[in-house]
Each structure stands twice: as structure tokens, then as C-alpha cells.
A protein has these predicted regions:
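Catalytic machinery of carbohydrate-active enzymes
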Residues: 49-51, 55-58, 74-580, 584-587, ...
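Short, basic, low-complexity termini and linkers enriched in Ser/Thr/Gly/Pro
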Residues: 41-44
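Charged, low-complexity eukaryotic segments
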Residues: 63-64
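Long, low-complexity, intrinsically disordered segments
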Residues: 2-20, 26-27, 38, 576-605
Length: 605
């Protein structure tokens, strides 16, 4: 509804969407558009602050109330340093020229920097920032360059932001008088003023009540008079005074930055980058940990891979941060990742199809192990990620070895944990732990009959290696990772706290269990996943069925339909080299090395 000024009982009253408001009403509250963007004064070192960004994995959790405050130079520099440590650097100031030395870019959202006019010839600008796909105005401001100003959208994920900058020129008095005479100030619509003054950009936009109040002052007289603010409203614009830019990533350099310190989820996210590049036709630069991009560099020749330390050498058109952003952050992600799941959250950040597609990896290495074998990984970065059943791994490994499988553990560490809570590789498995490259682990995974693991990075590697994955996880819901028909979860007990929006994961608490920590029900999500449950899922894997049928044919007198409850005897050569040790929180067990021919340990070069 257009806003109108009418005389009522000798005193003008404002009519509009918000009801009735008299001239002595308090100043209007901050509009929705204003709350969606930042308009901040840069610190004295001319480094403009941007919105506080929650970095991945809880390392930069910033409460919502802190996201709109101006920062001191020290605070801003510290924020940039933290961001660079996590993702890599972006230019301090935007790098794309607009008009009158105003610059912008799409690094960390749409950023616009208006420098102060040094010659004293100040100019007034109207700044529009609009998401063009949805038609949402995220910034509508009028400013004068008698001081420098920095604008930064709250939204950091992929959006079609358009930028319009209008250089305002004073309107001749004759046109102003015609406007006043035309309406007689008895019934005036702001929309009509815009149309009459040839304001093509904004004449179709809804004029909010607070904007009207800023432009008019109602006096206790028979007719309202205009104050100085109306001069701003009654100005027109010619084509050479307007700059407009719509988001256009084609053939532009765009950073997609992965958290440097995080490995697991980053492995599974890479197929979304290729989809993003095909969609935008941009020159994509993947900023990643070298340990990961060595895995993908030859598989994706159209994507350029760089390390975080090299980002200072570029001036990208746009930049997007990949990661899991905590505490209900919707600044770096359009949806809370707990609703979407770890695997698909990047598809929402980049606005691409979220179909599960495993990234391509090199699977050309020759097979090194002749016998049928199974790979396992038992360690996790938090205790809730592990399989906490007291005899789970031992019974599963014993059964698989009984029917003829070699069971190889490919964790990084033989012993992992925190304090006195330690997880060891299961007895009876072959030790292939160590600080190996991802490609070395894929070379083992690609030829195994199946992999048994947790919600961890090795499970993402197994997915890339295209082997069947038995994924044991209770603290995540099934949609959190990629789809596997061999998912093992017990929904009859507490489960899925990772994807529970009421629970914020604590990265500094290895024993995190948000609902039952310190009670007998702690970690019941995996404690109540039995070995029989896991073996029943394994029994549906075709390769296992063939192995089991072969064993049954060779041992018709033995019953193996159920999992083994007794420990199988150790071979003589293993008994000789058995090591007994007491483990403290500061020790690591190093099992004696054995040759490839003498099981159970193998050493693959």
C-alpha cells in the first residue's frame, strides 16, 4: 500500500503498512534490510572489517550478537589471521573497480568499499545490494564519501548478488517546485515522486515506512513541510551516474577453500567442486591441504590446486569456504549442516545437485595381496565415533579370519584416544597402520572384499575406492554420510546426537556425550550395536557370501552360521612374538614388525 499524507483533525497522520504513526513517534527501528548487511567504519589502518565468520569445526565460533559490531584494528587483524590459518587468505580490500574509486568483489560475501574523498569534493551515493535470484534486497543505503565506508553481506555462501551504485545529483529547484505543486502536499505518494524524478532503478521497489519518515518531517501546521532530507529524495540520475554489476562467474577466478586442518569430510566433498565448475564455467582454484589435492590433481585437470600459503598471490572474483559451521550458523551455509548431513552440506553452500557421487581417484595400482582380505579402521577423533561394544571388533575379526579372510587395519595410529581412554587395533588383525599417504591407503582399499569402519575419514576413502563399506555409527544419522546399503545403526537406543540441533559438538571434549555422559547410558548408541548385528549386515555382501560358501563346502562338519564367541588360537609364530605392554596416556605401542609372508603383519612398500 502506498504511503499517504492526509489531514486529520487538524494534524497530519501517516497511513501505511505499519498502521498509524503520528509525527511525535520515536525513530523507527532498524529495518530488515539494514539488519541483513553491515555498514561499518574501517579501522584506522584502512583494513575494512567483514562479518564475523564461524569457521569450520568450532575453531571460530562467534555468537550471533557479535556479528554486527565494529572491530578494533587488533581484533580485525586477529580475525583475518584466524581465517587465514583455517582456509587461506583473501585480499584485505575488494579488488574490482566500480565508479569513483569504489571497489567490490565477492570474497567472503559481496564486499563494497567506498574510500574517503581526499580532495574535499564529496559525493553522495545510493548503494543497492540485491540477491537477484530471489529478489531480496540485502542493502539499501545512502552515504556520502566524507568518510570511508565498508559494506559486507552477511551471507557468505553462493548467491547471485547484484550491486548498483547511483551517484546522486541535486535536482533543479524548478523540478522540485513542480513536484510540490503537483501534489499540493495534501496526498503524496513516495512511489510517484520516484517515478516523476526518473528514478528507474528503485521506482518499482516497495518504499518502507521508515524510509518515508527519514525523508519528511511533519509539522503542526495545516500542511506538512519538507525538511532537508527531501532534497535527497528529489534527485534524479542520468545513465553515466549509475554503476550496475550482476554476479557473473564465467571465466573468473574463484576460490573454493577447504579447512586446512581437516581431512576426513574434505575427501568426500570434492565431486561437488566439479559440478560447481561446470555450472558456473569459472576458473576454479581449489585451496586444500596438499595431502588431499595430491589425491585429486591428476583426476581433475580443469581445476587448479593451490596451498593456503599461495592464496596471497591471487585476486579472486569470489571465494567460498567449505566446512561444517557450528552453533546454528547460517552465515557460511544456507542450512544448518545438522539437517543436511556432513556429506551434502557443501552442495548447499555451492548451490549444486546433492546426489552422492564419489570423487574420482587413481585405482590403477596393481593388486599387492593375493589372498582375500578385509580392511578395517577402528579409531576416531572422538570416543563417540568409535564402536564402544566391549568385544565387538574382536569377535568380528575372529569370525572373518576363521572363514579365511585376512583382516588388515589401516588406521593411522595403533593406539588412539585421550587420557586413560585408549582404543587399540583389534587382536588378530594385520597391522598396516602408520603415516601413509591417502593414495597408499586407497591402493589397499580398492582390492579388499569390503571395508568395516566408522564415521571417519577412512570411510570416505573407502567410498572413493569403490569398495563395499560397512559403516558402524550411532552418533550420526544415516543421512549424515553417503548412502551405503551396509549401514549399521541401532535406532532402539539413543542415537544421532551429531545431527541433533539441540546439541552443539564440543571439539575439546574427547568424551563428548551430550545426553548421557557420566551415566550408565553413555555411548549406548554404539555400545548396543552387537557383533551379531554387524555380521548379519556383512552376510548380505556378495563377496562375503562367496567366501562363506567356500568355507562351508570345505568344512561341512562345522557350523559357522553364527558369529564366533570363542577366541581362535594364535599361530605358533605369533605366540613367539606376542608383546605384552602397559599403556599410559603418553605411550604408544609399536608392535614388532613382521614380513609380508609371515602373517598377521604385512609391510606394503
Amino acid at each position: 500500500m502506498p504511503l499517504q499524507l492526509k489531514k486529520k483533525a487538524g494534524k497530519p497522520v501517516l497511513h501505511g503498512n505499519a498502521g498509524q504513526q503520528q509525527n511525535n513517534s520515536p525513530a523507527p527501528q532498524q529495518s530488515q534490510e539494514q539488519t541483513m548487511t553491515q555498514s561499518q567504519q574501517p579501522p584506522v589502518n584502512s583494513q575494512p572489517p567483514s562479518s564475523s565468520t564461524n569457521a569450520a569445526f568450532g575453531m571460530m565460533d562467534v555468537p550471533e550478537s557479535e556479528r554486527h559490531k565494529s572491530m578494533s584494528p587488533e581484533e580485525y587483524n586477529a580475525k583475518l589471521d584466524r581465517r587465514e590459518l583455517l582456509f587461506g587468505a583473501i585480499p584485505m580490500l575488494p579488488t574490482i573497480p566500480a565508479i569513483d574509486k569504489i571497489v567490490f568483489d565477492y570474497c567472503d560475501g559481496l564486499r563494497v568499499f567506498v574510500p574517503k574523498a581526499e580532495d574535499g569534493n564529496f559525493t553522495t551515493y545510493r548503494i543497492f545490494m540485491k540477491e537477484e535470484q530471489f529478489g531480496t534486497i540485502v542493502c539499501h543505503d545512502v552515504m556520502t564519501n566524507n568518510e570511508q565506508k565498508f559494506y559486507n553481506t552477511i551471507q557468505k555462501y553462493y548467491c547471485h548478488f547484484g550491486l548498483t551504485i547511483i551517484r546522486l545529483v541535486p535536482l533543479p529547484d524548478s523540478i522540485r517546485d513542480n513536484v510540490m505543486k503537483h501534489y499540493g502536499l495534501t496526498a503524496i505518494e513516495v512511489q510517484q515522486i520516484y517515478e516523476l524524478c526518473q528514478f528507474p532503478l528503485v521506482k518499482q521497489e516497495q518504499i518502507e515506512e521508515d524510509i518515508f519518515n527519514k525523508c519528511f518531517v511533519l509539522r503542526e501546521s495545516e500542511r506538512p513541510r519538507y525538511a532537508h532530507a527531501i532534497d535527497e529524495l528529489l534527485r534524479y540520475v542520468q545513465d553515466n551516474h549509475t554503476f550496475h554489476h550482476s554476479f557473473d562467474p564465467k571465466d573468473k577466478e574463484i576460490f573454493v577453500q577447504f579447512p586446512i586442518s581437516t581431512i576426513g569430510d574434505s575427501i568426500g566433498w570434492f565431486s561437488y567442486l566439479e559440478r560447481f565448475q561446470k555450472k558456473t564455467q569459472c576458473k576454479l582454484l581449489a585451496v586444500m591441504n596438499p595431502a588431499i589435492y595430491d589425491l585429486y590433481e591428476k583426476q581433475y585437470p580443469t581445476i587448479k590446486f593451490i596451498e593456503a600459503r599461495d592464496t596471497r598471490n591471487y585476486k579472486p572474483y569470489a571465494c567460498y569456504n567449505m566446512g561444517l559451521f557450528f552453533k546454528a550458523n547460517t552465515t557460511n551455509q544456507p542450512y544448518d549442516f545438522r539437517y543436511i548431513g556432513n556429506g551434502r552440506t557443501v552442495s548447499k553452500i555451492l548451490d549444486v545437485d546433492d546426489t552422492d557421487i564419489a570423487p574420482r581417484v587413481d585405482l590403477s595400482a596393481p593388486r599387492r595381496i593375493k589372498e582375500p582380505y578385509v580392511c578395517i579402521a577402528v579409531n576416531g577423533s572422538a570416543y563417540c565415533k568409535t564402536w564402544t561394544h566391549p568385544t565387538g571388533w574382536q569377535e568380528v575379526v575372529a569370525h572373518l579370519r576363521k572363514i579365511g579372510y585376512r583382516v588388515i587395519c589401516i588406521d593411522k595410529d595403533k593406539v588412539a584416544g585421550s587420557g586413560v581412554v585408549l582404543t587399540h587395533i583389534p587382536w588378530g588383525c594385520e597391522d598396516e597402520t602408520g603415516n601413509k599417504t591417502f593414495q597408499e591407503r586407497i591402493n589397499i582399499l580398492k582390492d579388499c572384499d569390503f571395508f568395516i569402519g566408522l564415521s571417519s575419514g577412512v570411510s570416505w576413502l573407502a567410498w572413493c575406492a569403490k569398495c563395499p563399506v560397512v559403516l558402524i555409527s550411532g552418533f550420526t544419522n544415516p543421512y549424515n554420510e553417503y548412502y551405503t546399503p551396509y549401514r549399521v545403526i541401532n535406532p532402539m537406543v539413543c542415537h544421532g546426537c551429531w545431527n541433533d540441533e539441540t546439541c552443539d559438538f564440543d571439539h575439546y571434549d574427547y568424551m563428548w556425550c551430550p545426553k548421557h555422559k557420566g551415566t550408565p547410558r553413555a555411548y549406548e548408541c554404539t555400545k548396543n550395536i552387537t557383533p551379531e548385528h554387524v555380521l548379519n549386515v556383512i552376510a548380505t555382501i556378495p563377496a562375503y557370501q562367496k567366501m562363506k560358501a567356500k568355507y562351508d563346502a570345505e568344512h561341512p562338519e562345522k557350523e559357522t552360521s553364527k558369529y564366533l564367541k570363542t577366541e581362535i588360537p594364535m599361530p605358533v609364530e605369533e605366540k613367539k612374538e606376542e608383546v605384552k605392554a602397559t599403556v599410559t596416556s603418553s605411550e604408544t605401542i609399536s608392535a614388532p614388525s613382521q614380513s609380508f609372508d609371515n602373517q598377521p603383519c604385512i609391510n606394503i612398500q
